[in-house]
Amino acid sequence: DPGSQGVGAEAENTGERTGGEAEAPAEGENGERSGGDAALGGESEGKAENESEGDIPAERRGDDEDEGEIQAEGGEVKGDEDEGEIQAGEGGEVEGDEDEGEIQAGEGGEVEGDEDEGEIQAGEGGEVEGDEDEGEIQAGEGGEVKDDEGEIQAGEAGEVEGEDGEVEGGEDEGEIQAGEGGEGETGEQELNAEIQGEAKDDEEGVDGEGGGDGGDSEDEEEEDEEEDEEEEEEEEEEEEEENEQPLSLEWPETRRKQAIYLFLLPIVFPLWLTVPDVRRLEAKKFFVITFLGSILWIAM
């Protein structure tokens, strides 16, 4: 019951309500909230049930713009979601429940926020818990969380643990864990993928060289086969030339061959006598006469 609690933790809710719906200061759809520093001036006073004395004035100033932002002393949580940016302080967990919207805080306790009631109570060393419909953003000291659709878990040394808190984000589509300094599992995965790709390229290169060597050996085998075939053909031609009978000027036995012989004799005999490459070199001067006579004989 908010009435039973003291005035020790004050908060100015800057959320606007339109059509009976309240927008939470922690997260506003299409709104940007810049909250002032929460000065911890001691222990909270007026708290029911064993609360220590102290003043925790919390001032909140915010303008409803495209992104909501809450800055607290000691750390930042930036979410690039449509719902806004949340920057959370050192040593605490922040979880928002849009449905219930309750934020209650006590020293060493839990804080729940209710958008309908518009109450925000923050305590030193406390926790803020809630369930968002689309996701949870929890941030620790020195970690930045940027979310578009998936879950980002950020913290020192690639874990979601801050100095006194944890950073956890959960959404249905996936998880991304990032460490301080911009290095995380995604970077390691990319490096592993690059290394594997280079190894595959090297293997393919080795395979390609082996394939090239195999192709060269096949070409050499084909050339050897062609050379063997050519040698065999030459040997066969030589054998045929040796087995051939020389041209004979003897009278043929068949009448057909005899007729051809008689027809060619006036041409062949003078040419045989007068051709320059024949045995009788002295008759080469008559070559012109015999050549013209052979032409006339053929014409007749």
Curated annotation (Swiss-Prot):
One MF annotation (Gene Ontology) recorded for this entry: calcium channel activity
Ranges annotated as biased composition (Acidic residues): 92-102, 109-119, 126-136, 158-175, 215-244
Domain of life of the source: Eukaryota
GO cellular component terms listed in the entry, alphabetical order: plasma membrane
Positions of the UniProt region annotated as Disordered: 1-251
Keywords: Antiport, Calcium, Calcium transport, Cell membrane, Ion transport, Membrane, Potassium, Potassium transport, Sensory transduction, Sodium, Sodium transport, Symport, Transmembrane, Transmembrane helix, Transport, Vision
Transmembrane segments: 259-275
InterPro entries, alphabetized: K/Na/Ca-exchanger
Known catalytic reactions: Ca(2+)(out) + K(+)(out) + 4 Na(+)(in) = Ca(2+)(in) + K(+)(in) + 4 Na(+)(out)
GO biological process, one term: intracellular calcium ion homeostasis
Post-translational modification: The uncleaved signal sequence is required for efficient membrane targeting and proper membrane integration and topology.
Family, as annotated: Belongs to the Ca(2+):cation antiporter (CaCA) (TC 2.A.19) family. SLC24A subfamily.
Function: Calcium, potassium:sodium antiporter that transports 1 Ca(2+) and 1 K(+) in exchange for 4 Na(+). Critical component of the visual transduction cascade, controlling the calcium concentration of outer segments during light and darkness. Light causes a rapid lowering of cytosolic free calcium in the outer segment of both retinal rod and cone photoreceptors and the light-induced lowering of calcium is caused by extrusion via this protein which plays a key role in the process of light adaptation.
Name the record gives this protein: Sodium/potassium/calcium exchanger 1
Organism name: Bison bison (American bison)
